[in-house]
């Protein structure tokens, strides 16, 4: 991904904030779902098969196929990813956005959906090096490395760039206090962190404590902090959303325990990244903010 003048991405250069972020929220400890895998938090090993014509088959935590014409087939949770696809299409078509950061990108399905709907500057970030490698292999097979790129990343450290849209899917229950440590500041600090890298919209998937995955693995309880489970609530999350952003929409992605919050970036309480110097901000391709 280039950061030449005119690109939708610009490098993040605020050294003071970088220093504070590194001290405050670096990955606290390695906590893996399956100890047999040396990286990541998922049990599934990523597998990618690339045909001679460029068609791609990905299996693992995410399961999808990309055909030679660019069409994507969702092999699991098609209803969920179809909803996300519709939201991305609206962000691109109605608002003109073309840059997106996919936080917790895994094998790149969300990024591929964004690319398919018209985003042309997409960066994936994940702490699992095997899935990051899979993402980049898929991008290369689709001849899309100028538009799609992923790199290894620890949540809470500075992102390498900023974008008009930041998407953070299905990792809140991990980063709240387990694979990262935002326990002291809670959802307020998580949103403040993410908002530094989104110039227009922030999309976050809420994972409710009633979710089967959370009830089975007990992510928050595993943090070992007294009373922490009482802080990981939808009421606290929505309070932080209302404090730091304008909520444009929310919709269930996969039952009532997984809900996507679509937020517009504000200038509240000096928390907006627009407080930085104009030269450090990505250009606003279209700043229309009608009803989402």
Question: What are these model-derived regions, one by one?
Answer:
Residues 227-243:
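Short alpha-helix
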Residues 170-174:
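Short catalytic micro-motifs in class I SAM-dependent methyltransferases
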Residues 196-209:
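Conserved beta-strand signature within the Rossmann-like core of class I S-adenosyl-L-methionine
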Residues 251-273:
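Core SAM-dependent methyltransferase catalytic element
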Residues 6-161, 289-292:
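Conserved N-terminal segment of class I S-adenosyl-L-methionine
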Residues 167:
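A conserved beta-strand element that flanks and buttresses the S-adenosyl-L-methionine
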Residues 175-193:
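A short, conserved alpha-helix within the catalytic core of class I
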Residues 7, 269, 275-276, 284:
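Acidic, Ala/Val/Gly-enriched low-complexity intrinsically disordered segments
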